[in-house]
Amino acid sequence: MLNIIINAYACSPNMGSEPGMAWNWCINLAKHCELHIITEGEFKEKIETALPTLPQGKNMHFYYNPVSDEIRKMCWNQGDWRFYKYYKQWQWKTYEMAKDIIAKQKIDIIHQLNMIGFREPGYLWKIENKPIVWGPIGGKI
């Protein structure tokens, strides 16, 4: 079974759009892989409630990298320039968390899942000796 780190800023079992997309990728990958999912903390309660109801829930390990309510509200408005500032900071902390996970777990692949704009690749690509998957990728030029 492959062990995968997934970076999914927005991930929720009860939503559509980015959070729902990430959740659906994760629940389907977890049928075949062991996942270590780093996500923001907004949907923690919903995630923790849903996991025990899924047969593949035992293959889904969540690590939360929460932001303040003020930053969270700002980040939902991605047109705000501050979104990019705080999202980059969040991505750097996620990179540090991923390195800690790799030090403790056998990880085969890294997946940069969302947010899915080509302008925000995160920092997980800096991790050496691990293949990285980035996408799906959206955005317009």
Language model regions located:
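Short catalytic/ligand-binding loop motif for oxyanion handling, primarily in non-cytosolic enzymes
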Residues: 14-15, 44-46, 71-72, 117-121, ...
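N-terminal subdomain of nucleotide-sugar transferases
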Residues: 1-58, 103-105, 128-131
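A conserved catalytic-core segment of Leloir-type glycosyltransferases
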Residues: 36-92
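An aromatic- and histidine-rich active-site surface loop
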Residues: 86-95, 109-141
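Short linear interaction motif-like sites in intrinsically disordered regions of transcription factors
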Residues: 24-26, 77, 91, 126
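Acceptor-binding helix/loop patch of EC 2.4 sugar-transfer enzymes
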Residues: 9, 69-82, 130-141
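Short, well-structured alpha-helical segments in soluble
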Residues: 93-105
